[in-house]
Regions:
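S-adenosyl-L-methionine
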Residues: 1-26, 65-80, 112-160
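Short, glycine/acidic-rich beta->alpha junctions
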Residues: 103, 143, 169
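Conserved class I S-adenosyl-L-methionine
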Residues: 159-169
């Protein structure tokens, strides 16, 4: 897939990936994947997922969205339907009749729809991994650390060999 690398692992693997991946921007958990061409299908299939395994009762879970070449192209409506489905699921599982407080930790979610295929993910990273930088002061347009690491890997550079950067300024 363009822009993604998938792997299977456990919680330890997620922590290790966030700590040591040099070229990644984010590490996300795939919560669910399915096809949906209408809002009812999106709602029901989202609600059927085991959200209680990932989100505590007080979780704040903002839902970001994107849609490409799909019948469900109104992103704000898609985000609202996904949010409502998760709230319904958690309210049922946690036996809540009142509104969920969402005062706890934040669990950023994303709904991405491409050609009617829905991918629901939970972001485990927080700020982008390129922001973990080692530099205290940065110039006007620094190269992101993950991009620099990718370029070094693509160049087949070995320690001890000189590095020439013709665009260093």
């Amino acid at each position: 897939e363009n822009g993604r690398v998938r792997f299977e692992g456990d919680l330890r693997d997620i922590m290790v990936a966030n700590l040591w991946l040099r070229t990644a921007d984010r590490v996300k958990i795939i919560v669910g994947e399915f096809d949906a061409t209408d809002f009812d299908s999106l709602f029901e299939q989202t609600k059927a997922l085991p959200w209680e395994d990932l989100l505590p009762i007080d979780a704040a879970f903002p839902v970001e969205g994107k849609s490409h070449r799909s019948q469900l192209h109104n992103v704000p409506s898609v985000q609202a339907i996904v949010k409502k489905a998760i709230v319904d699921r958690l309210s049922t599982v946690y036996h809540r009749r009142t509104r969920l407080s969402e005062t706890g930790a934040t669990y950023p979610l994303e709904v991405a729809i491409n050609k009617d295929h829905v991918l629901l993910t939970l972001d485990t990273t927080g700020p982008s991994l390129f922001k973990r930088g080692y530099r205290k002061g940065k110039g006007g347009a620094p190269l992101k650390e993950n991009m620099a690491a990718a370029l070094v890997m693509l160049a087949h550079w070995f320690p001890g060999n000189p590095v020439v950067d013709p665009v260093f300024g």
